[in-house]
């Protein structure tokens, strides 16, 4: 394929993830998007997570609990575009994987529960999006229920998430009185027809808010609705494509995912406005998405994707060029050329061999323990993609063995699980404890389960007096040595051998930062 043809193909790609607070409707929206992209024929309501529809749950523990702990990847075609959707665990407990998945996308869809507004998980995920000024499109969900005043929800997005919000459409009524949405840019009313499961309701439109049909539909409410729309126009931001691409403004759509309404309009806007694959920074140079030379990085490693094989799949975001079956690529960290004949692509748990993939696509490489998160692969050039960080854990436990003779297996298991990003492990300098850190409680359960299942090690967790962790470094060796001497009780080495400060309280961390101004305390660490 000639370069111009490759550039055309790349321009069609839209790679994004959905962020939301648990139960805001993310899984339902994911299903409806796949439905519009003809990727699934039946949108089974997600309440039946253990049913045959639960395409993305394949670790046994997930199947037992009916939650998606692992991020899946789904690709579907829509309106001459190719959409790559990276699913992020939305359960009450999520993990660092969720954060890292956001480093592999070009834009994000934020789903907000219209009744609850902006919730704390959304705030956290938004902070990660801010690291790269990721463009964000918003969908305010559950309009067929009684929700908060839409103006209030918009204000909350602006105040709490510090981003301008530009409504593209506006709801007419809500709950039982929900009539549909009015598009502020096309002067069209889209009538609400409830579509369930795999039925896509017909898009019934009325042109013109001042038309006779609109008056007939709205009856006694007609004047109120027109006044409200006037006020909304005056009081909200107008959509601006450049501001959206810069991560400064979010276009907002209203609808109901369960009622299958408003998702199509949102998807139409998304494929039209969301950026195609973006250029990426490496330590050496900027890599353009439409370069001929192949490059990509690993953002996630998933064990046991196939219970029959103890394999681990490394998820790679292709950043430039093209992957084709059987090609050679350079594993930069190891300085080795590897031939990749069996990369896989995914429809949530269905694995199929991939013939080729281009910039913006996600492929899975079989990993026998040699690939780590953050690894760069290229067509030979020495490159190291940046911006794929470790995030400081927020929860900590000491880990103890039921059988002390299995220390070796425990250390090997923890080493592998930390390389994979399932947990972070810390070895304090002054004692023989092993401390594990995580972003969500569920990560601890996953680690205990997998140590037992894969490494035959039974471990017990105990509370430990650690509130937060920071990676530390200092350019002045003398000052670093003094810091290490005075603070050795709080220092540990992480799984990669990096010096880490384990703070018992936030106050302790603040005092240490003040006391040692030459030491950098970092909440993230590049891989």
UniProtKB/Swiss-Prot annotation:
Every tr-type G domain range: 11-278
Keywords linked to the UniProt accession: Cytoplasm, GTP-binding, Nucleotide-binding, Protein biosynthesis
Positions that bind GTP: 20-27, 87-91, 141-144
Primary location: cytoplasm
GO biological process: one example: regulation of translational termination
Any one Gene Ontology cellular component term annotated for this protein: cytosol
Gene3D superfamilies: P-loop containing nucleotide triphosphate hydrolases, Peptide chain release factor 3, domain III
NCBIfam families named among the record's database cross-references: prfC (TIGR00503), PRK00741.1 (NF001964), small_GTP (TIGR00231)
The protein, known as: Peptide chain release factor 3
Gene name tied to this protein: prfC
């Amino acid at each position: 394929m000639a370069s111009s043809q490759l550039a055309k193909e790349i321009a069609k790609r839209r790679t994004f993830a959905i962020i939301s607070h648990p139960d805001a409707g993310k899984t339902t929206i994911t299903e409806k998007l796949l439905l519009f992209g003809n990727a699934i024929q039946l949108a089974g309501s997600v309440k039946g997570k253990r049913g045959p529809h639960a395409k993305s749950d394949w670790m046994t523990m997930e199947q037992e609990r009916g939650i998606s702990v692992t991020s899946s990847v789904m690709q579907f075609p829509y309106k001459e575009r190719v959409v790559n959707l990276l699913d992020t665990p939305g359960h009450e407990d999520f993990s660092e994987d969720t954060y890292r998945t956001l480093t592999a996308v070009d834009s994000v869809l934020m789903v907000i529960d219209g009744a609850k507004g902006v919730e704390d998980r959304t705030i956290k995920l938004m902070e990660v999006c801010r690291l790269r000024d990721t463009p964000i499109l918003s969908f305010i969900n559950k309009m067929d229920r009684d929700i908060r005043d839409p103006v209030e929800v918009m204000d909350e997005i602006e105040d709490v998430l510090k981003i301008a919000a530009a409504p593209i459409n506006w709801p007419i009524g809500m709950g039982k009185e929900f009539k549909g949405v009015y598009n502020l840019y096309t002067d069209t009313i889209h009538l609400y027809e409830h579509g369930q499961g795999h039925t896509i309701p017909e898009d019934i439109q009325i042109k013109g808010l001042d038309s006779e049909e609109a008056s007939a539909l709205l009856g006694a409410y007609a004047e109120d609705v027109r006044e409200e729309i006037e006020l909304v126009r005056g009081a909200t931001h107008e959509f601006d494509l450049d501001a959206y691409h810069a991560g400064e403004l979010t276009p907002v759509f209203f609808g109901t995912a369960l009622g299958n309404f408003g998702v199509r309009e949102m998807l139409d806007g998304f494929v039209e406005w969301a950026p195609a694959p973006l250029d990426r920074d490496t330590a050496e140079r900027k890599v353009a998405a439409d370069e001929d030379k192949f490059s990509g990085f690993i953002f996630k490693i998933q064990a046991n994707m196939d219970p029959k094989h103890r394999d681990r799949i490394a998820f790679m975001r292709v950043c430039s060029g093209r992957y084709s079956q059987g090609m050679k690529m350079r594993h930069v960290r190891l300085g080795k050329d590897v031939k990749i004949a069996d990369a896989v692509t995914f429809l949530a748990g269905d694995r199929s061999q991939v013939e080729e993939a281009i910039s913006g696509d996600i492929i899975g490489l079989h990993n026998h323990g040699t690939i780590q998160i953050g690894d760069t692969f290229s067509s030979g050039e020495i490159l190291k993609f940046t911006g794929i960080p470790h995030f400081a854990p927020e929860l900590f436990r000491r880990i103890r063995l039921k059988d002390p003779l299995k220390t070796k297996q425990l250390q090997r298991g923890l080493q592998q699980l930390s390389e994979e990003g399932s947990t972070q492990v810390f070895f304090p300098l002054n004692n023989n404890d092993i401390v594990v850190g995580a972003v969500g409680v569920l990560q601890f359960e996953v680690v205990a389960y997998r140590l037992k299942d894969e490494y035959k090690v039974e471990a017990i967790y105990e509370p430990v007096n650690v509130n937060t962790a920071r990676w530390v470094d200092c350019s002045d060796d003398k000052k670093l040595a003094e810091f290490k001497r005075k603070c050795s009780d709080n220092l540990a080495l992480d799984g990669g051998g990096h010096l880490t400060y384990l703070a018992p309280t936030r106050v302790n961390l603040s005092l240490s930062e003040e006391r040692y101004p030459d030491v950098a305390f970092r909440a993230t660490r590049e891989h």
